Amino acid sequence: MKTLKITRLLSLIATLVFMLIAFLPKAINETDDWIMIVVLAVAFVALPTNLMYYTKREKSSRYLVDTENGMLLLNIIVFGILLIMNAVGLVVVLINGGGSYWGYLSWISASLYIILNNIILYKAKKTLSANLQ
């Protein structure tokens, strides 16, 4: 569970740094391209790690395993799409040396990942606690 929290924190940090780089370009010096590449790599590693721990460690709860509500399938589809967006963003940033609009797919996907993952996790915990009462 600690690894899951750490990778979620890494995703959040990566998202915040990308938003700063994207919206505050005057505050960043010439090294912003390398900062983008490093932070994008962190987000790229954090997303699949989150997916792995989310599906392996938390699938024991009855709510997530229940295929009738499709939560696990939704997780796999959503995280798969976000991982593809992240991979595309990483490749384009590496090819262009940063600063590309395609590179911003990475922080968009990280933002969506954080929002959707927390909504899914909250709903799963709420339903599981209601079922146990």
Describe each region flagged by the PLM:
Residues 5-15, 19, 38, 86-133:
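Alpha-helical membrane-associated segments of multi-pass integral membrane proteins
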Residues 1-10, 67-78:
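Juxtamembrane interface helix immediately N-terminal to a transmembrane segment
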Residues 42-49, 69-92, 108-114:
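Hydrophobic alpha-helical membrane segments
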Residues 1-48:
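N-terminal signal-anchor transmembrane alpha-helix
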